[in-house]
């Protein structure tokens, strides 16, 4: 018995076969799209995790900054209490070197502020607030509520700004009497000529103001023969957390004034001392 081999492709059963191309394409598209979707989801997840980590990092950084600011505030408030004249002298001399960096060592030596030029007020243990200014001033050795000569102040208080000077002035006015004026010495709304006339006509016990105006008055009308103390309003910090020595606007004026010929000679002769409040 013989068998005939038939090629399946050659078999014509006269039936039409239709291939579901749409279904095949859909399946194909789903299969090809699936890896992309997974990748996109994974990438999105990574981005979210990265954003969360960055947010946590920023939050930790802000917490550190807040803690640091509180610590600095605490240290600054007590700075002039816990620091000795030697330390404060070094502080001022470092600023002097920084500001007059173009001077030679010999020239800088003429501007050195010695520890003996700084009054040791460690024994005044009360907080350095504006309300305690009158008591602090009365605590200074040799303080009297009597000025001998017009235009010859006994105490000058250097402040970072006119607004701060006004704050210091308010409680300190309690020290004022006929022969001991507490004067506001800043340029805002007051002309230099007006200040000169006022100082020449009055006995200034405490002059409170900004360094530029006080320096002008020192050059124009103050004799400084009886100047006992220059108080730096050092503990106060402005809205930018600057002190009178760290603020660019006030630092150079303060150092220029403290190292001026008149003031340095007074300090060398032990007539005048610097105080940190």
Curated annotation (Swiss-Prot):
<protein>
    <recommendedName>
        <fullName>Protein cms1</fullName>
    </recommendedName>
</protein>
<dbReference type="Pfam" id="PF14617">
    <property type="entry name" value="CMS1"/>
</dbReference>
<feature type="region of interest" description="Disordered">
    <location>
        <begin position="28"/>
        <end position="68"/>
    </location>
</feature>
<feature type="compositionally biased region" description="Polar residues">
    <location>
        <begin position="33"/>
        <end position="49"/>
    </location>
</feature>
<dbReference type="GO" id="GO:0030686">
    <property type="term" value="C:90S preribosome"/>
</dbReference>
<comment type="function">
    <text>May play a role in the regulation of DNA replication and cell cycle control.</text>
</comment>
<keyword id="KW-0539">Nucleus</keyword>
<feature type="compositionally biased region" description="Basic residues">
    <location>
        <begin position="53"/>
        <end position="68"/>
    </location>
</feature>
<dbReference type="InterPro" id="IPR032704">
    <property type="entry name" value="Cms1"/>
</dbReference>
<dbReference type="GO" id="GO:0042274">
    <property type="term" value="P:ribosomal small subunit biogenesis"/>
</dbReference>
<comment type="similarity">
    <text>Belongs to the CMS1 family.</text>
</comment>
<dbReference type="GO" id="GO:0005634">
    <property type="term" value="C:nucleus"/>
</dbReference>
